[in-house]
């Protein structure tokens, strides 16, 4: 039985910031959109009631029994992990598996659990980008851009309200293309309409055809923002019936996707690059393919299990592909075209905790948040 110890730090946390769990998760769901996650994933709120009050959070890579015990001792009532505790359906809660025991202990102690997994991987400033920063890469871009997550919005706005509606759309999140925002295209034209006897038109008279100088405005948005953007459009637009069209786009989403590619400040011999990875990631069991004999300048990388991106890394012309969980036969695929480096799953994703903490502090600077001190890496090296 684990007993809760009410610490002075927890008391300070309560004095600084208490909020509803739904306020916290609503922000994270927006900052790390759940729509970005892969179909097999289960990111988001795993345990907790929306109206539950939270006062301090602990960030970890994995939720384990020791991490839950640590949270109880530190009086943290929210755990935020990279890897979800629950991937598949739980059919019973008897304590026979480690997942069941963790769930039981967390629920019993009113500890909420939130996870940000592949949606955090997809972010332009996500797990792989953090790896790239840690080893000092420049000119960082996405290795495997995501697709089918963009919509084009076309709407028609009277000239008198164009700026108001445009600003409302941009504030709702529309108009972002890569590192650019407030992106749109406008062209003037003439719109016509006739309202029936039940209408109350903003311009013109009911029952009569009316022509109005309007601006056709086009912009783009991510699919997960559709409801928010349309709500902003309808609220800012003066017409009773707002005319708009939404089109699904097949464009790659610049800035969203798996992995990164970047350039080292100075080329390194392959063994020196391996020493850099050993030092930065504290990677004690690096596996790598046969050296190519080339200097390392262009680096492709993907935090966690990224072997599926080997061919894409080769096609970028990268000298090295740094990732984890590479299978034996995958090492044959390179044919000496690229150096494959497996630095470990835990090692390549452990900096995800820093991303989560920075996001939280940015929005809630007075909310108490700490890193778990428990090493959750299940792999040991002899």
Residues covered by each model-derived region:
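Short, low-complexity, charge-dense intrinsically disordered segments
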Residues: 1-16
